Amino acid sequence: MDSKYVLALIVLSSLICSGNIMAQEGIGKCRPVDLRCEHLIRPLGIDRAEPRFSWHLEDERNGAEQLSYRIMLGTDSAALVRNKGVIWQEKKNSGQMLTTYKGKALKPFTRYYWSVTVWDQNRQVSEQTISSFETGFLNTAQWKGSFISDGKDIESRETPYFRKEFILKKNVKSARAYIVAAGLYELSLNGSKVGDHFLDPAFTDYGKRLLYVTYDVTQLLHEGENAVGVILGNGWYNHQPVAEWNFHKAPWRNRPSFCLNIHVQYTDGTADIITSDHSFKVAAGPITFNAIYVAENYDFRKEFQGWNTLTFDDSSWKQAVEVSSPCSNIVSQSMHPIRKTEFRKPVSLKKLSDTLYLYDFGQNWSGITEFRVQGLPGTKVKLHHGEQLDSRRKRLFDDNNTQFYQNVKEPLKYGVHPVDEIFATDVLWLDGKENTFSPRFNYKGFQYVEVSSDKPLELTKDNMTSYFIHTDVPVSGSFECSDSLINRLWRATNYSYLSNLVGYPTDCPHREKNGWTGDAHLAMETGLYSFDGITFYEKWMADHRDNMYGNGQLRCIIPSGGWGGDIADWTCSVTIIPWTLYEFYGDMTCLKDNYSTMKKHTDYWLSKFPDGLITDACLGDWIPYKSVANRELTASIYHYKNVDIVSRTAQLLGFKSDYEYYKSEAERIKDTINQKFLNKETGIYANGYQTELSMPLYWGIVPEDCIQKVAEQLTKRVSEDRDHLDVGIMGCKTILNALTETGNVEQAYRMVTQQDYPSWGNWLRQGGTTLFENWDYNGLAAGYSQNHIMYGEIGAWFYKALAGINIDPAQSGFKNILLKPHFVEDLDYVKASYKSPFGLIVSEWTRKQGKVEYKVVIPPGATATLYLDGKGEAKQLSSGTVSYTHLTLP
């Protein structure tokens, strides 16, 4: 729609004529807030030699900015306030709010305090703001004690429980527990679980890197006798069920083990270290089986109450076995942990018989259940989790057990798959008392739970609770509009995104749980607009480095135990992830850490396909509606993007010769793509399908003089498809953006709000609460997932197109915001916010009586370039709040 706007009023404490917001005196003072070390608030166990420090400003004045800053670091907070005891300081005349430590080598196991002071646009100094961080192990040699295990065979189904009593001789000032495990663990002190983490530590290539976790346990220890307990789970380390992804053949596979160091500081200045060794006792506990894909078996008759307290008699327990470290590279898990973040009670309960019940929680997600029950001793109960009901909607339909074991030619060591090894099914044996069960070392993807038993049970809604489990990334964005369908789609996208964050990005939380690289890079923008995910993705890029072969090849799932081929349009995650982090955060660290990996992988493809086109080794536009896009075209576009990102990264990092070489290669690949696939007369790529037209437009392949033609062909094609989607996951990433960027946002909006097949809305109309794996709802009967994130770009589009919050490629980290709100005809209002590295960006508009009011908040230190309705004359804005009212449509 070609609209002209009349500017009637531009207000909120400022007058804009020339495009500048004048600074206002006396309204507020500048103050540094949200201080972070390594993008975390007051983190423990930092092991980076040169940690990063960041902050943003709190200042209500329009035009607020930081002209300069001073950062100081020391070990005494009181002294630091007086500018004393400074170990390192940095003062710069700069508006940057991210810097890196450049002082003397930090000491291990030390709490450091750091402060930030800034000078504002009027050269007035702010108050000093102080935060802290603690270092952990700065090299593996600093670990004491030994890894310990129960010494059982890797196929043993028993879950080991470890315990030890120890004496602290003095009054405790502070204490830290450092624990690293090959497998999963639950740590307790004096009968209390340590921390609120779940499924720790995160999945890695265990032969290349182990993660340790740090806890403040000061309040859990005391002078005198204490007790420590550890339960070990198999996790991703020891896959016992045979599966088609060959994790049971992973080179790292072994019996789980752990190493524990507890550092205790006494009030008199002395210290002790409690370590794991053969003095720990071990026994098999009530968890009789645990597997990350399958579930847990729990026998309440085998419980030993108080096993992790001082009063327990462990005389029948055996001595733990000291084992060698599974890996020489042990690093800190410096990211947000997996946690329980939300719970739900059932929305319905169907009693099908006195031994069969069906719970519906009304929301599909990744998680676990807590089940409270009382039954006759020895009663066997199965909790079968799933996301789909059968055609009569009375029983749970779940084809995942077949999916999990399909194509498997070999049996388990003990001959056959045990009858209780059913996918996503916990199995319990009751002891006649009131029993409460919740798994420790497993999670599922589900909405429904079918409870079956071999003896009658009387159950109500109160017997079961569902918990949402995922990497607990902080919320960074919000979105709301007048269309309830779009609001539901935004929520469904977020549930799918979070359901697939478990220390690494997965495709789905129920069946595969695999780190498919393509799904992850396609959904990344959606994730980062709504959630602060930098620490999560930086960890996953370390997984990329660990999983790379000497020739630069990567597997299509990461981490991988060896399964998976090299797939060019998937493994481009190695360049897209670091580059997208740089765009969102303005932080080059991930690019620096991964440059050699990015370069090596790109060189692998350049050598394998010297002509510039990827002719095989690709998956293409996965699961399209009907039209199958040319895979050589789509894969070659991602090949171009790989090379282009390496070129841009080389330029940023000052590698001139690399920059020139890869820039030349990128242009050569682009030219080759256009020569083979573009008809310049018609503006059609390949067959002219939606994906084949939108991908070249979105990824910058189309020659400047052909953009209009290609855009016209795209909108024509979409019109022929009745404004419906005809794409797979690659086209899903680009179709809405390409339409919007070429002036066809109304058509994109119509596509988004369709509710018949194929569409996002159709999934919700069919009862979905997350995004699906297949456009065809009926295809779910073939085992397709109802909780996949690969079609999730729509979530980012809400922010970019409707609210208009966009990255400026020339100024990363939202230093300058490209504001392109589109006032689509069928919406009455849009409200969105995004917490950028500079602070909160707010963009909202309302339509009243045919006129639009638009309001934007630009955080201190940032600027914006505004295009009303996504086009027209650019308006330059500085920080503050700006309102446009009475924008009229002709």
Predicted feature locations:
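Conserved, charged catalytic cores of large soluble enzymes
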Residues: 134-138, 197, 617, 637-652
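Bacterial Sec-dependent N-terminal signal peptides
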Residues: 1-30
